[in-house]
From Swiss-Prot:
The name this protein goes by in its record: Ribosomal protein uS12 methylthiotransferase RimO
Enzyme superclass (EC): transferase
Localization, UniProt: Cytoplasm
Organism of this sequence: Opitutus terrae (strain DSM 11246 / JCM 15787 / PB90-1)
Annotated Radical SAM core domain residues: 152-395
Lineage: Bacteria, Pseudomonadati, Verrucomicrobiota, Opitutia, Opitutales
Family: Belongs to the methylthiotransferase family. RimO subfamily.
Binding residues annotated for [4Fe-4S] cluster 2, in chain numbering: C166, C170, C173
NCBIfam families: 30S ribosomal protein S12 methylthiotransferase RimO, MiaB/RimO family radical SAM methylthiotransferase
Amino acid sequence: MIKVSLISLGCAKNLVDSEIMVGHLHQAGMAVIPEAEKADVVIVNTCSFIDSSKEESIGHILEVHQHRGLRKRRKEQKLIVAGCMSQRFSKDLSSSLHDEVDAFIGLDQVTKVAPIIQEIYARERTKTDDPVSFVEGRSTFIPDYDTPRFRLTPKHFAYVKIAEGCNHPCTFCIIPQIRGRHRSRTVESVVAEVRQLVREGVKEINLISQDTTFFGMDTWEQRPNPRTPVDSGRGTALTTLLRQLNAIEGDFWIRLLYTHPAHWSDELIRTIAECPKVARYIDIPLQHISDAMLSRMQRETSGGYIRDLIARIRAGIPGIAVRTTFIVGFPGETDADVDELCAFISETKFERLGVFRYSQEDGTRAAKMPEQLSAKTKEARWHRTMALQKQIAADVSKTYVGRTLRVLVEEPGVARGEADAPDIDGRVYVPRELPVGEFADVTVTGYHDYDLLALPPGQKPAQWKVARQAQ
């Protein structure tokens, strides 16, 4: 039996691709093991969103190659590179990683990984042969509800990819060139998958894609544009999906990630407010507030539009936690642009916020723009905005003290609230005896920046110990 070890890097969307590969390997009778040193084949599922992601991916590839030369039994081990970096740069990497890599596979080969492994073993590669590339053109694959998949997340939460690809023209982003144009799954396919996950005991469904708000629009008879609002009157839309998911029997959260501000509509706001299973949490990357920056980024929004949208979301969905991300150091960004961004962050007080330093990515229009900023300037602006948000986060956390929250227990002593997505947001530290993978009601007793401390109602602090991570 061939033993395969898989290293998954990058975002949750890449993790789903890894889960699909593992599912197909199991179906083909291959063993998937966590220890790379014991595997016959190692697959590195790479990320190439920004330079640091590519560097991390290449670092893992080189580490696997280095280790397989240290032990006699690993010298015949095969190394396969998959994922976004392979899809985008396989031709370039074929020469630079000639000695390290046996094969490159693209995004459309995640369901073909087992026969590809068998083909690699059937070939006799000489030292002068280039690595085999199975990468095809622009990706067109999209998973279905019955696509074999082995979940790599804890049993109580899952990521569900509702679409693939992106139609947005953001000047800083390479993703549309890697993952292709937007293509939605059917509502029936997503509902079938979620229903099965709930049957298996999943308590949190995280909906993901490059742009979840564009779901269904690619099937409309009248073609939408990058600013078309969610509107079920024109055809299948995200609101259609959310209402059908909300109707599934069971006790679970539906969390909406990766929304685009240009597509938000009053219908979407109303739908979230009317669907109790949809978490009072939204992920809406805004990227900037300066009109000049939004125009150069080609974000299809304006500062005025964004301010109005956030106000409408908060008014229409009481108790909503808004998560966003911004980019600082974009070409041409001035001190005045950063001042405006910081003022906006201060006045809006986002419940959750992250900041990226702009990364000059080959193949993007922004990479060729004049007025590229220095790494020192980017770093200073990142520190300024994050320091501001750290204080805001503490102020937001303070408002939770004394409130009762429903949390999902992640591990002994650690939980997440409705306002906390997996991996990217804060934690709620709770007594260790609360059952993992289940919901619990707790009262917040304290906080530390982004994290909360909480107890079951009526329990006194002396009756429990804080989880080690919080000490």
